[in-house]
Amino acid sequence: MKFSANWITSPKDSGAAVYTYQKSFSLRSAVKKATLYISAQGVYVPTLNGARVGAFVMAPGWTCYKTRTQYQTYDITNMLKEENTLSVGVGQGWAVGHIGYANTNHYFADFVALICEMHIEYQDGAKEIIASDESFDIYTSPVTFSEIYHGETCDMTAPIELVGKAKLTTVNTELVEQVGEDVTEQERLRPIALIITPKGERVLDFGQNMTGYVEVKVKGNRGDRIVIHKAEILDQDGNFY
């Protein structure tokens, strides 16, 4: 598909934080079919009216971004209401963040960017395209640092602030339709053991190696800080490695 949308980015450099790109819109009448086409320079998570769109993790996926970047296609027909808000969190990912084999940041690109468009077909035959442009609002998010190889920092007390209107930009890549399978969550694992190491560290053992992330529910006071470190093994003395 050839995009009619523009690449957009934040008027302020987001650094390693995740900014939210947001667009509110109204429907003219009853909808027959609606499709979202979307990609990013970085990684993105889309929501529509507060619900997650699709299940792809780390979209748009790994490619050589200097030559091609995949885009995803989502059927959003049943997610639409009379009044709607599309929100897309965009982070650095591989394109902008740290790349291990190159031992550098910004190996493919210097800034995050988003491109998307919604194709809406109404039951009366009318058609509409809502595309990324300068009308998108950019907001901060609780994710103040996000890096594939260096973890994530979330400040749930941080106020959500309007950064400004999106600005148009140029991304030197070819947008191509996704060629592989979706990368999605496959299972939810619970720890099989709680280990107290000789140093007094509390280690949750999940019983296997994996690619994933931790979900935790906690009680505490405003300003409390929770730090989770991950490792594959313990050292020879049984301490966290």
PLM features: what roles do these ranges have?
Residues 1-241:
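Extracellular/oxidizing-compartment recognition motifs
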